[in-house]
Each structure stands twice: as C-alpha cells, then as structure tokens.
Amino acid sequence: MHSFKLLLALIVAICTSCDAVPRGSLSDESNFKSYPVAQYEAANHRLLRAKDGKVRADEERLSSNPDSMLTRIKSFVNPGPFHELVRTATAIAERLKETVHSTLDHWLTIQRFNHLLGHCDHDSMDSAIVRGFHPSEFRVWLDLKSPLATEVVDSLDEWPKSTQLQSLLKFIKHYHSLLLPPPNHWAKVRASINPSHASSKPLFHDVYGIKEALEEMDHIIDQDLSVATMLEQKVSPLLYKVALEARELKTGKRIDRSKLNRFIKGYMAQYPSLDKFESMVNGYAPPGKFRKIPTFKGLDDDVINPPKYLNP
C-alpha cells in the first residue's frame, strides 16, 4: 500500500510538471533559442496558455479548407509548429494592445516580419511601406531586430529611449506622406525607377518584389469591395492606391478616385495622429523632442513634408 501511494505521488508530480510547461512550448529551453520572437513567450506564458485551446481550434478550422490562405502559405513557409507561432504572435499583439487582427493575421504578420528581416534595415523603409506594413507592425519588427529585444520585455520604459522610437516616428511620417503625396509624385518616382518605361511600367512592379501583392490588390479592385469591407479586412490603402495606378497605366483609362479618397479617410480615422502616437509611446518626453525627422535618401524634400493634419 505504501509503495502504491509513492507511485501515485510520483505520477501526480510528473503530470504537474508537464502541465507547467506544455510539450513543444517555446518555454522549453531546447526550443526557446530557435525562435526569433521567443522572448515574448516567456513574458506572456500564462496568457498564452489560457488562449491555447482557442488557437488550436482556429488551426483545425483553417487547416480544414485545402484552398485556404493558410494551406497555401504552409506549402512554402514552414518556420515551426503552427500553434506555437500563433501563440507567440498573439502575445506580441496583446503587448501592443492590438486587437483588430484575427489569429491567422497574427501568424501571417510574423511571416512578413521574418521575410522583411532579411531585406530591409532601419533606414530603408520604402520596401516596408510598399509591402503594406502598418506602423504598429513596424514597431514589432524593430523590437525583433533590436539587439536589446531580450531587455524590452523586462523594461518597456527603456524602449522609447533607444533609436527605435526615432525610426518608428520616421516610418509613421513617411507612411502618411506617401498616402497623400504631392501632385505628380508617383510619375516622378516611376521616371526615376526606369525613365524608358515611365509611361507603361506599373509602379514598384518587380522593383520591390511585390508583384504578388499587386496582383492580390487587382482581385480586390475586381471584386469592387466596399470601403467598410476593405477597412474590416485591413487592406493596405497604399497598395490599393498603387494597384489603381498600375491598372490605369495598363488600360490607359482614368479610374474614379472617390472610393480611394473615402478609403484613406476612413483608414486614417482608425489610427492616432503622429502627435497622439508620440504621447502614447513617449509620454514623459518634452513636446517636440522627436519631431525633427531627417529627410530620406533618394526622395524629394516635398515628399517628406507630412500632410497638414499631422501638424495641427
């Protein structure tokens, strides 16, 4: 009887330890270092475990459709166990207090981060913008790229003191200036890319490697989605604008801009202005501390000046 009690106690102890660290979790030391965003798992472990059941259900639901985006993505991207990556991405979204994306969007966003890490640096923001990155996503990318990323989780107050905040504010200003550029800006950019094809080559086509993204925007244009639907699906207004101009170049016909204008206006209304964003991430800094933003190499000065609504 005594031996039976000892055996039972041993089984309970083993089960308890297994429950504390799920098998295959990023909290397992053997797996921890193999993930670029593993540090977020440790900081959000309890939160993630509570969400684990929902994430696994989402995985099964999404995987059941052979034509789904998930199935197509998994055919050429295999970074690790799907549910672990989703849980980590969900933790990042929670940390940023971003609740507008679905679980699948979080996972796809991580794939975009991983792809961009090898193609861009802090000062080369054009490719990040034209690929459809939003400023909140760019901040996560900066966190991942930073050598201080392991310290960010333990001391969030240290983050605004680094050069990352300046990079992020540069990105936001550049992002908004490209959404509402000066007249004839895109024509000048096209001419600078390839003067001999200035009137026929679609903007950024094959230059930044986003042919697939523009083709996806083409489908959205063909479907004639409403502004509300595009906002709900988090369509990038910049890519939508570029796709419209690419179609105009292809067909030679002018496309009505009224929907694009409503789309941009609705999109901007969902996100804070630059001033509000500064207050949010850098509340203790003196006003205007980060407002002197350097010009971008290779771009005209008039492109860098932000729209008036950013400087009320």
UniProtKB/Swiss-Prot annotation:
Compartments in which it is found: Secreted; Host nucleus
GO cellular component: extracellular region; host cell nucleus
Main location: secreted
Motif window: RxLR-dEER: 46-61
Signal peptide (residue range): 1-20
UniProt keyword terms in alphabetical order: Host nucleus, Secreted, Signal, Virulence
Function description: Secreted effector that completely suppresses the host cell death induced by cell death-inducing proteins.
Domain comment, as recorded: The RxLR-dEER motif acts to carry the protein into the host cell cytoplasm through binding to cell surface phosphatidylinositol-3-phosphate.
Family the entry assigns: Belongs to the RxLR effector family.
Name assigned to this protein: Secreted RxLR effector protein 14
